[in-house]
């Protein structure tokens, strides 16, 4: 099977990019029976070690990670170029790891899109700075749902909100829980623990989950 994947949010520094990088890297390492075709709008060398992965770089006026942000939107011509690239590839299915970077796919091609939650729809006043940004986000979400055969999300609670606030059909939503990145791990290094406690005063005997950033060796 030849599986097409939107990888234009690979360089996103927030959750969308982290999820995409973690999921695809693990998938390519575990599954060598299928061929994967990635569609990007930037040079991508991170997956060159995988012989069963092909990267198709599509020219764009601005990378998705710059264009798909608050108070901005992607060029229709850039999305058309991505559509044509997907339409011209011999794919069996198309997958979008994040609705954030979604673009139209051919209607005849089975498509799956990940919708992580409905926070933007539930609390729009906290997310959008203008009616314009809210309008384009809502339009993209509605088109992505309509264009997809299946929707992937991460929890039953997220599924319920996607149904309630976005209007997706419950029977079209599948749930797959997320695994932590190997970088997140329990430490027994007492020096790090003491330093973390010094930065964030804690009470003795109480358990905490702390995010601690260390330099790579």
What do these predicted ranges mean?
Residues 1-217:
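Carbohydrate transferase catalytic cores enriched for Leloir-type hexosyltransferases
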